[in-house]
Each structure stands twice: as C-alpha cells, then as structure tokens.
Amino acid sequence: MRKTRVFIAFLLVFSLINGFSYASDTIPLQCMNKKTLSLRVSNVIKGCEKTEVSLGAGAIPHSLIRPNALDKQLMYRFKAAQAAAKKDGQKIYIVSGFRSLERQKVLFAQAVKKYGSEKVASKWVAPPLISHHPWGVAIDVNYPNEPVGAGWLEVNGSKFGLCRVFENEWWHFEPVIAPGWKCPALVPDARYSKD
C-alpha cells in the first residue's frame, strides 16, 4: 500500500512538472526589437534576444510601491503599438500617463467642483486611490482631438497587451492582458475600476 502511494505521488509530481514545462513552451511572448521596434513571437522558455525587449507574458499589475514614472514595460508595449500604427498610417501618442497622487487629487477635486458630487465626478475622473495613473499603469492617448488613432489602438491594442477599459473614455488604455490575448469587455466608467 505504501509503495502504491509513493508511486501515485511520483506520477502526480512528474505530470505536474511535465505539464508546466509543456505549458511554458507554448505560452507566447512578444519580443520587440529595440532599434526597429518590430515584433517577434517567442515563448517564455526561449525568451527574447539581447537586441530585444519583452512585452511581457501577462497583465502588468501595479507595484506595491508607488512609482514616479510610467511603467517601463507599458512604455515598451506602447512604443511597439505606436510603430505598428505608423505603418498603418495612423498616429498615436500619449497625452497623459503617469500622474502623481497629488495631481490625481487635484484633477478629482476639479471634477467634483465641475459635476457637483464625487459620485458624478467619478464617472469621468477616477478618485486618487482608485486611478491607475498614479501607479504608472494607465495612459490617455490622442485626447481630445484625435479619436481615430485611439480607435486604431482599441482595435489593435490587444496584440500589444493594451486595452481600452471604460465605455465613456475612448482615450484611456491599460495593460490589463498579456499581448495577444483578448481584451475584456468595457466597463461603464471609472467607478467600476478593479482594485
């Protein structure tokens, strides 16, 4: 009986190890050439070449410590998307990315004054502790005058792990998926942010 349990445990561990290794071989990894900004697909085991930078194999969560700049991997993803948009004759650019917590507080206070309540203001400007801008993992593109480029990013952004997240903000994108995955459904507004 003991030998049977040991054998079953061995098979379980063996299958977990082999399953993990197989899965890692098949998890795609987007690699961007640092000079040409072109993309190549690798996998998480092989990784990227020295002349490339990884766009990551998952969503980009905010760190535990507040940053003072836009997330580096988010910038790589945006630069890759920007290069692809340019090839398609579209222009995309960041209007707003990282914001300090203090700046987000000011923007929210202005929105409260404009809309008359925190509840209504939250539809358009996320409260400071909810907004992903102070964490460096949100960008606003082409606002307010060039929604066509932002539309290109909405259609093609998933290739780069960038998704529009709010129905009422065509300009707001976040790295909520791995490059190549499908973007989640839009939420109505910033009041529905996860975190």
Give the ranges of each region predicted by the language model.
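Extracytoplasmic cell-surface/polysaccharide-interacting catalytic and binding patches
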Residues: 16-97, 101-195
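Bacterial N-terminal signal peptides that target proteins for export
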Residues: 1-8
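Bacterial N-terminal signal peptides
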Residues: 8-16
